[in-house]
């Protein structure tokens, strides 16, 4: 009788292990099988995702993702789980998530209805509004003041799309220039090649604070729209991983 009970317990243990293994799908299974989790980061999205003086990815969003990694090590029972950092841009971040190159994008990405057709998002971790920064000497205070001006924004962002729609809707005649990244856009403003830079207000504030002469700049009080949510971006349709990230954060 005792022998039968022991055998039954062993069978149940094996079955339980097998079921647990089968239950891992999508991103969790990929991470478990490869022993690597890949984090997408931005190199100049202060204070959320950027490179420090040692060229190490840091920031608030990166910290959130590293917390997820710690939880992954425990859940998957892989204490030696490796973390690979993969740089992304505004233009490349969605394709790299969608094609599986990156497991989590930890930058400064809006969770929008349009983007939900391609990717998914975890819990909101910050709210920010789309505004513009300009030099105080330009005396640009409202969106209407941008009429006829050269205005830069970053390629592949919701910000430049919103700027374009506002330009058309309000017939402002703005010349819109797309920069490769936030640093390039701010440099265009700093060197006079653009009159204003449209971006998330928190990112603009960080760029101004880190500039040579912060007092030279002014961020508009008027926003292009209501505040929108930042969230960690993950693959679409992977409810298991989404639930895990939400629980971990």
Give the label of every model feature segment:
Residues 92, 106-117, 161-169, 187-226:
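A ligand-binding cleft/hinge motif common to bilobed small-molecule-binding domains
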Residues 11-19:
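Hydrophobic h-region of N-terminal signal peptides that target proteins for export
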Residues 43, 126-134, 201-202, 209-249:
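Periplasmic-binding protein-like
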């Amino acid at each position: 009788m005792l022998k039968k009970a022991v055998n039954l317990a062993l069978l149940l243990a094996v079955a339980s292990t097998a079921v647990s293994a089968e239950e891992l799908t999508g991103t969790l299974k990929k991470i478990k099988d490869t022993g690597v989790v890949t984090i997408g980061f931005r190199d100049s999205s202060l204070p959320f995702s950027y490179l420090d003086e040692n060229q190490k990815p840091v920031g608030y969003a990166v910290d959130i993702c590293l917390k997820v990694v710690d939880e992954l090590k425990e859940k998957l029972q892989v204490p030696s789980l490796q973390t690979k950092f993969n740089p992304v841009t505004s233009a490349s971040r969605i394709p790299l998530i969608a094609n599986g190159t990156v497991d989590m994008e930890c930058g400064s990405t809006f969770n929008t209805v349009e983007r939900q057709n391609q990717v998914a998002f975890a819990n909101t971790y910050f709210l920010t509004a789309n505004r513009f920064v300009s030099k105080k000497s330009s005396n640009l205070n409202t969106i209407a003041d941008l009429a006829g001006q050269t205005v830069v924004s970053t390629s592949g962002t919701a910000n430049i799309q919103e700027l374009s729609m506002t330009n058309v809707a309000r017939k402002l005649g703005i010349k819109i220039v797309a920069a490769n990244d936030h640093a390039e856009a701010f440099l265009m403003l700093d060197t006079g090649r653009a009159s204003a830079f449209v971006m998330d207000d928190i990112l603009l504030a960080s760029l101004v604070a880190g500039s040579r002469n912060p007092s030279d700049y002014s961020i508009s009080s008027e926003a292009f729209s209501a505040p929108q949510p930042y969230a960690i971006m993950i693959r679409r349709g992977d409810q298991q991983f989404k639930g895990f990230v939400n629980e971990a954060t």
